[in-house]
């Protein structure tokens, strides 16, 4: 029996409110592909009403935003988001099916030496360095419209601050005092067990917002987090340090353990730029590979890792896929500075 196909003209003649309701139920990973269907689809996919509908019907998703920064003086940021890749009939290369799609975001504020934190569908850009001076500014990226808004300034200027979200509030530490390196005093914040853990130097402290108490963590938690990458997934801290394995922190015995099961991943170069992020309970891992004559360019790679706790002393990672996700090489001057998971 022959199936009846819906005429293309019928789809394109749908009123905007109905089209918004339909597209709101499609995974946001597919939006870049849908934007290629027609100018009208591309226009509807930018409407705030679309994202309001997604929120109302409970269909928001974790979306990974990636920011590449140039070492040039102007520090122009380039923004991307992870999405599904259009598969062409002529494609012969085995692919994960994912790619970093460019996001045109005009009038981006400086992001050099600042801290980014996601709050709902927004990304807060806090502090940093503007014209080689510490900044107290706060700017907000609306990930529905991809426009920047000016937020309330901090009372203190901060360079290399660390920001975390806890109970609906953003806590910012560090970055106030200039050291002899010309950088702010540096800490790294993570939220575990409902407490803000702040590590800097050789010791750390934990802040409990319920009773306002600060408790010492000692030195066992600190591994120089500021110079690598860390994230918290389902109340467990994960951490990467140059040329080492990915580790997780066992709060019961207060020690770091190696994340098992990642033998299919390559060994990262000593000075590779590695970033970790919580991607809906899985680990998103980004790193770069040097290419070209004299390692003049970089390729940006990504792996999505499912995590499984097998007993109290072991966590295993299963690499679901890994692939080069930027379709082209980038000059050595560009680094993957930030990876942020946003609910949109």
UniProtKB/Swiss-Prot annotation:
Write one Pfam family the protein is assigned to: Kelch_FKB95
Keywords attached to this entry: Kelch repeat, Repeat
The ranges of the Kelch repeats are 122-168, 170-195, 196-241, 243-276
Would I find Zinc among this entry's keywords?
A: no
Q: Which SMART domains match?
A: FBOX
Recorded hits in InterPro entries, A to Z, give: F-box-like_dom_sf, F-box/kelch-repeat_ARATH, F-box_dom, Kelch-typ_b-propeller
- Please report the stretch or stretches of sequence annotated as the F-box domain: 8-54
Keyword Transport recorded: no
Under what name is this protein listed? Putative F-box/kelch-repeat protein At1g19930
Please give the organism. Answer: Arabidopsis thaliana (Mouse-ear cress)
